[in-house]
Amino acid sequence: MSKAFNNLAFDIMTAVSFDTDFNTMEKPEYRFALKAIEDSNVRLGVLLQAPELSVRSLDKKLFPTAYVAKYKFVKFIRMVMAKRLAASKATSKDIFSFLQDCKDPDSGKELSIAELSTETATFIVAGADTSSTSMAAVSHYITGSSNCYRRVAEEVRSTFCSVDEICLGPKLNSCAFLRACIDEALRLSPPGGSALWREVEQGGTLIDGTYVPGHCEVAVGIYSIHHSAAYYTKPFTYDPERWYRPLDAKGSRSEAPRSPYMPFSVGPRSCVGKPLAIAQMMIVFARLLWEYDMRRADYKSDWAEGDYSSTEYALKDHLTAWKEGPVLRFSPRLKP
């Protein structure tokens, strides 16, 4: 599923960014761009934690494959931009068209071609790679136990009368358990779970009562926060019910704490694509659950009956995340 979701997320983000359908779900022609992103991210992930490795181009010697991949992706972006610039600006409402209209509030200058290239490349890498990881994680967790799968499938199938009804709106928003499954998957397997370093401003600051001098870099890994017993009961167990509770006697929900929950980071540099990512996952899994019965390929009759799976979807930190699997079987469901 990791490869399938890579293709799907790439197709969605390139369509949103450039109003272009590369259809990598069905055709292999442009899948090299996905491989280039994956290979290039290995180097970037290391440099994020150890930027000194870039001195005298040491990283080029350590990661030759990543360097080749970088130029392949740059070449792809230039090709896409050339086609997009040749198209009429007025006919598209993609991200690229909005970037073309951006102007510096002080100078009034528009973005240069190089700046447009950088911004759109960032949208594709950040949007496609993280979304595909999130969807792969959700598919792993909801197929990990009969309890979870049956409940989320029943919620979707009882909410919509046909697959054509599945779209953004009140009905989809009412699928609270599906949203809880997504939130819990993002807690256990955040697509960007490493430490995102920030430099302390001149003069220093107090962090939780400890003075940190200016120009020091500080960070805490999102993965470690999400797995802290200080915030979550049984932090290594997949339990979507921690995000979903029936109304209690006082009419309020009892939910897990939101403040330490940060799969999209926090603050002014948090992910601007969060609403798009959540909407994308809600629609994708609502449609999959309505159309198909899903099982893991190694499905057995003792399928974690009545329990949630404690097996974590493993990720490797490559700037965003490298993943593999799960392997699932799909069969068209018998509709009433």
From Swiss-Prot:
UniProt keyword Oxidoreductase, yes or no: yes
The protein's enzyme class: oxidoreductase
Keyword field contains Metal-binding: yes
Molecular function via GO: heme binding; iron ion binding; monooxygenase activity; oxidoreductase activity, acting on paired donors, with incorporation or reduction of molecular oxygen
Residues that, per the record, bind heme: 271
Entry-linked Gene3D superfamilies: Cytochrome P450
Pathway: Secondary metabolite biosynthesis
Keywords linked to the UniProt accession: Heme, Iron, Metal-binding, Monooxygenase, Oxidoreductase
SUPFAM superfamilies per UniProt: Cytochrome P450 (SSF48264)
Cofactors demanded by this protein: heme
Top-rank taxon, per record: Eukaryota
InterPro entries, per the entry: Cyt_P450, Cyt_P450_CS, Cyt_P450_E_grp-I, Cyt_P450_sf, Cytochrome_P450_monoxygenase
EC number of this enzyme: 1.-.-.-
Conditions for induction: Expression is positively regulated by the leucinostatins biosynthesis cluster-specific transcription regulator lcsF.
Functional summary from the UniProt entry: Cytochrome P450 monooxygenase; part of the gene cluster that mediates the biosynthesis of the lipopeptide antibiotics leucinostatins that show extensive biological activities, including antimalarial, antiviral, antibacterial, antifungal, and antitumor activities, as well as phytotoxic.
Family matches, as PANTHER family: CYTOCHROME P450, CYTOCHROME P450 MONOOXYGENASE ATNE-RELATED
Similarity comment text for this entry: Belongs to the cytochrome P450 family.
Protein name in UniProt: Cytochrome P450 monooxygenase lcsN
Gene this protein is translated from: lcsN
